[in-house]
Amino acid sequence: MTTPPVPGQPQPPSHVLRPESIERFDRGNGVVTIPFVGKWNTTGNAVTTGMTVFAPGTGIPLHSHNVEETVLVFDGEATAVVGEEEFELVAGQATWVPAGIPHCFRNRGSGSMTIYWVYGGRDVTRTVTATGETFEHLSDRDRGATPAS
């Protein structure tokens, strides 16, 4: 027997998350995020997870978060900038980025590139390095994918 949902309250997701049935968050310019677990669908999560798919030649501007993040290159080829260092990554390789450290990921390949990300917290913010602007992760202001440079 299941408990009826409380109107206006987030509900736990299925124990099996199927990307094809999850509403996508379009960041613009060929970058799309598939949010898995977060405060939008769970009440007690301690992490926030999802996948982001990058078209060839796209990326997300240099930014930082208020919580740590690990990113796994799930498919394709990426350039990762973490702090002052730049890394070339392929599928199966991952990064760990402490809170407050500027970073970004760009698709350096000729096909799509997909990352799987995990944030170490429920209330995640993004601060754009170039402007200092801070906003809630996956809010309407969290768009603005750019061509890779």
What are the residue ranges of the model-derived segments?
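A short hydrophobic beta-strand segment most commonly corresponding to one strand
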Residues: 52, 96, 111-126
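A short, N-terminal "cap"/entry segment at the start of jelly-roll beta-barrel domains
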Residues: 1-46, 130-149
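Short acidic-glycine-tyrosine-enriched beta hairpin
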Residues: 84-99
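Well-ordered beta-strand scaffold positions
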Residues: 52, 77, 85-87
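A generic "binding-loop/recognition-motif" signal
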Residues: 56-58, 66-67, 85, 101-102, ...
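Conserved short histidine dyad/triad with adjacent acidic residue
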Residues: 33-37, 50-65
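Short beta-strand His + acidic residue motifs that chelate non-heme Fe in jelly-roll/DSBH
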Residues: 60-62, 80-81, 97, 103-109
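Glycine- and acidic-residue-biased ligand/ion/polar-headgroup-sensing regions
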Residues: 68, 73-78
